């Protein structure tokens, strides 16, 4: 298809630039910013005629070892990959309907290791970005503050809807703390996470968006 040709052309250019450095890349997703028919912007080319058509899109690439590892895991579990995309693309398609994409909004999927960002404007997804800080930073702050292992820190996060949180530290001592105190101890880590994500949004968008949507387990804190 027209879009696929464009994405493959971008991949060829990327491979040519990185032949002697990072190896090959796989295109794992793309989104159309706009179609042009005879240099006029159009929502869809289907059913239209003209002398000149073009497409502007964003294509996302991952190093081949990363993609091959994903396929290897699926193969070991007897599963088959039918399609591959990025988390922010999937989240944006589910959560932000096309009519809302007319507004300049950012969607942030806060996972464990990364926070993936997608930005929409004028009906299209216009940028992607990634912050390398996410939910694990909160877990690590709990580990440092309360001298617990990773699994216990995760359990404490999951118990934070209760009025008090009970846990056992690495020395075997039992503790019970107020949930308000627990959240207060995490404010520095949460502020740092929010600041990092905000910087990446502004860098990708060029300015602060009209609204920010948060999804993913890390956003629940």
Each model region followed by its residue ranges:
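Nucleotide/phosphate-binding catalytic cleft detector across ATP-hydrolyzing
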Residues: 1-105, 162-169, 176-186, 204-211
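Phosphate-binding glycine-rich/basic clefts of nucleotide- and phosphate-handling proteins
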Residues: 28, 59, 64-72, 120-211, ...
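Short hydrophobic/aromatic-rich motifs at helix boundaries and adjacent loops
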Residues: 41-44, 110-113, 169-172, 196
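Gly/Thr-rich phosphate-binding beta-strand-loop-beta motif of the actin/hexokinase/Hsp70
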Residues: 98-128, 142
């Amino acid at each position: 298809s027209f879009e696929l040709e464009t994405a493959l052309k971008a991949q060829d250019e990327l491979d040519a630039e990185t032949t002697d450095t990072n190896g090959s890349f796989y295109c794992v997703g793309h989104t159309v910013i706009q179609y042009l028919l005879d240099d006029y912007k159009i929502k869809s080319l289907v059913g239209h005629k003209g002398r000149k058509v073009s497409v502007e899109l964003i294509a996302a690439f991952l190093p081949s070892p990363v993609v091959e590892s994903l396929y290897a895991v699926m193969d070991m579990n007897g599963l088959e990959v039918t399609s591959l995309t990025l988390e922010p693309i999937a989240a944006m398609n589910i959560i932000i309907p096309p009519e809302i994409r007319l507004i300049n909004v950012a969607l942030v999927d806060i996972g464990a290791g990364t926070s993936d960002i997608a930005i929409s404007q004028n009906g299209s997804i216009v940028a992607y970005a990634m912050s390398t800080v996410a939910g694990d930073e909160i877990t690590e702050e709990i580990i440092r503050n309360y001298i617990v292992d990773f699994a216990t820190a995760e359990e404490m996060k999951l118990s934070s809807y209760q009025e008090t949180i009970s846990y056992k530290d690495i020395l075997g001592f039992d503790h019970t703390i107020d949930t308000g105190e627990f959240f207060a101890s995490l404010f520095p880590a949460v502020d740092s996470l929010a600041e990092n994500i905000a910087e990446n949004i502004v860098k990708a968008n060029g300015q602060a968006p009209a609204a920010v949507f948060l999804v993913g387990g890390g956003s629940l804190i």
